[in-house]
Amino acid sequence: MYELVQVSEKCYYINCPAKIGVYVADKDHVYLVDSGNDKDAGRKVRQILDKNGWHLAAILNTHSNADHIGGNKYLQGQTGCKVYSGGIEAAFTKYPVLEPSFLYGGYPCKDLRHKFLMAQESDVTDFSDESFPKEIEVIPLPGHFFDMVGFRMPDNVVFLADCISSRETLDKYAVSFIYDVEAYLKTLDMVEEMEAAMFVPAHAEASADIKKLVRYNRDKVHEVAEKILSICKEPICFERILQEVFKGYGLSMNFEQYVLVGSTVRSYLSWLKDTGRLSAEFQDCMLLWQSV
């Protein structure tokens, strides 16, 4: 864990739970793609940079999930580096309590205010700022989270953030986090047609060809959608739907999984209703969902 892996002349990744990209701009300065999940991750990254004689120019955040921005505060405090982000992701990075609040749908209890869902805050500079390195292409990858992006480096390595999960992860957990199902599927279509010397997803193996994995992710989305539709053959409330999803996939429920899977199931319900496959009605002061 935390090994430095070279994928091109100027690009590396640090192998950790959410891969951290490294772009060597010149012999002295590097840009990180994300920063790991906490202060300890940031410290390990700093040791790697020091060992190679690299100065940290900036962190480029793909999105604001805590496992991608958790090292920001430590690294920014140690080096004075900029942290680049954009859109809603920038707001969540500056005000991290927004993530557990959004997931829970209200003020999060202490069980949800921890480093896995709520990073420490960091100062943010927008991607549009003149100081952002012009040689790096910012690629919009919405769907998994609000304004998630990837980055194409000058030597044609693309860091894909969380837009695809590994087969192993999908086989084990089935329901990967998705904020906007329609946007996510469009992102998968776009990524499937993308060409690069190497793709580096945060939660799957780096590869020059990711088309099969993209298709596997897409198939899993449609599988989950069909499962939800089958659960909704008779009018049913959200909590019962969530219970059946957990039981159907053999998932274990705790506060963290309740909000992560629960938020995703709500996103599926919205998508299925908006595409005419689910109806919703209020009965006896309850919102009930039913397949059309």
Ranges and model annotations:
Residues 22, 29, 41-43, 57, ...:
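A structural signal for the main folded, soluble domain(s) of proteins
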Residues 40-132:
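Active-site HxH/HxHxD metal-binding segment of metal-dependent hydrolases
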Residues 10, 23, 34, 49, ...:
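Divalent metal-coordination and catalytic microenvironments
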Residues 37, 135-225:
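Metallo-beta-lactamase
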Residues 1-52, 150-161:
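Conserved beta-strand hairpin/beta-sheet module of binuclear metal-dependent hydrolase folds
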Residues 230-292:
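C-terminal regulatory/interaction regions
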